A protein has these predicted regions:
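Ligand-binding pockets and gating/stacking loops
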Residues: 1-430
């Protein structure tokens, strides 16, 4: 653990914000496959290898709760390293919230979202399957935003209606750009106190907002009265997304289109400094989907997903979840490998969005933030809880030179000790 963090916290440059985000992906990566490093299912993370510390052999066995499997206890233990405190409560705080409380005990600046929680997922029988930010007392740190338009409104587009205390809300203006036109003109005009580089950056930020408004709300420039209300999400939500645990049919294109918009909007919120803490989920713990579609990576076809056909089953038995139940070190595990590889591609999609902009210290938001990637288990067979909760995959970013990236480390330690090392390096403790 001593090798994870640089010895002197003073190595971190102080002129960028402290940020902490948790990135969760469902079902996990079996520990034996993690040993293959970037030559296996972790390949999509390879272009970012210099900015990541991959941690193998992280032990989350203390999170075991009798009578339930890792889809519940391991999922709630991700980023908390504690057994679940109930069906809708963690056994302690998540690491992002420990860091938030340490650096902002009185709250963040007005106008900022204290904690942003979003994701693309379908299983929802317990909150811990999909929500991964918890307060110091283990309660959820915010409301999950599972639709792109809801996440956009959470960050940019809703204000309280009056001061009469009722719960009604109204939209500030459907277009964020309409609400900042005067400021934009001033800060990019002749009397602006900004330099040319800063003016350019302001313009680029607003152009990026316009791009996401168009995508999230189907805005049409010809509509003089503003954009249309956003359409319903093209994927299922609520009870329809988890019909009795039987799973849903979905194409790879439908899944990734929804996720990319969600990931883009979340990254935009961070880039605009509206959000510094929170979590994002790509597929819930124990996710049940029947995925169909050609999967390509780096210009080559990796696999053709067709879960129900390849499993020769329908309902829950025809879902990709079953490949984790069927995992064996003695088999090729072709289908599981393809699914896990795809999940790493989509995690990398989000990370790359945060690696595009440089901050004042010359590093990207990705490099300056503490972004922790994890999942619920290191084995999906459910017949050995110790094996199931051992070897849980973790990766972290450098957090502004606080952690040593560019390595794959066999940690061989409890998740609780790993997390305490991390938050300690961030100037926090719990």
């Amino acid at each position: 653990l001593d090798e994870m963090a640089f010895s002197a916290a003073s190595t971190a440059v102080k002129d960028v914000p402290v940020r902490a985000f948790n990135v969760f992906f469902g079902l996990g990566i079996p520990a034996p496959l993690q040993k293959e490093g970037y030559e296996g299912v972790l390949e999509p993370l390879k272009p970012l290898r210099d900015k990541l510390l991959i941690m193998r052999n992280v032990d989350q066995v203390r999170c075991d709760v009798s009578g339930i499997n890792a889809h519940f206890d391991g999922a709630t233990g991700s980023f908390t390293a504690m057994p679940a405190g109930g069906e809708a409560k963690a056994g302690g705080p998540s690491i992002d919230q420990v860091v938030r409380q340490a650096h902002h005990p009185g709250g963040l600046s007005p106008g900022m979202v204290p904690t942003l929680i979003g994701g693309t997922y379908f299983r929802r029988s317990r909150v811990g399957r999909y929500l991964h930010s918890y307060n110091l007392d283990g309660t959820v740190a915010g409301t999950m935003q599972e639709k792109p338009r809801d996440l956009f409104d959470r960050v940019f587009g809703v204000v309280n209606a009056g001061t009469d205390g009722d719960a009604r809300k109204q939209r500030l203006k459907r277009s964020v750009l309409d609400s900042v036109v005067d400021q934009y003109k001033f800060y990019t005009g002749a009397n602006s106190p900004l330099g040319s580089a800063s003016k350019t950056r302001v313009a680029e930020h607003l152009e990026r907002i316009r791009e996401y408004e168009l995508r999230a709300f189907e805005m049409k420039h010809r509509n003089s009265e503003g954009p249309k209300l956003p359409p319903r999400s093209k994927v299922l939500h609520g009870g329809q997304a988890d019909p009795g645990g039987q799973g849903i049919d979905i194409t790879l294109e439908e899944l990734t289109t929804e996720w990319h918009l969600m990931a883009d909007l979340y990254a935009l919120s961070v880039q605009m400094d509206r959000v510094r803490f929170g979590s994002i989920t790509f597929l819930a713990a124990g996710e049940r989907i029947r995925l169909v579609g050609d999967y390509e990576y780096d210009g080559r076809k990796i696999f053709e997903f067709n879960d129900p056909k390849q499993l020769n089953a329908s309902g829950d038995q025809g879902c990709s979840h079953e490949w984790w139940h069927k995992f064996s070190e003695k088999k090729k595990n072709e289908q599981l490998r393809a699914h896990a590889h795809m999940k790493m591609r989509e995690v990398a999609y989000f990370l790359n969005r945060l690696d595009s902009d440089k901050e004042a210290n010359g590093k990207s938001i990705l490099e300056n933030s503490m972004i922790t990637i994890s999942t619920e288990s290191g084995d999906g067979r459910h017949n050995d809880s110790k094996r199931e909760l051992s070897g849980v995959f973790h990766a972290i970013t450098g957090a502004n030179s606080r952690f040593k990236t560019g390595e794959i480390m066999d940690v061989g330690a409890e998740g609780l000790d790993v997390y305490n090392t991390m938050v300690g390096a961030m100037g926090a403790k719990h």
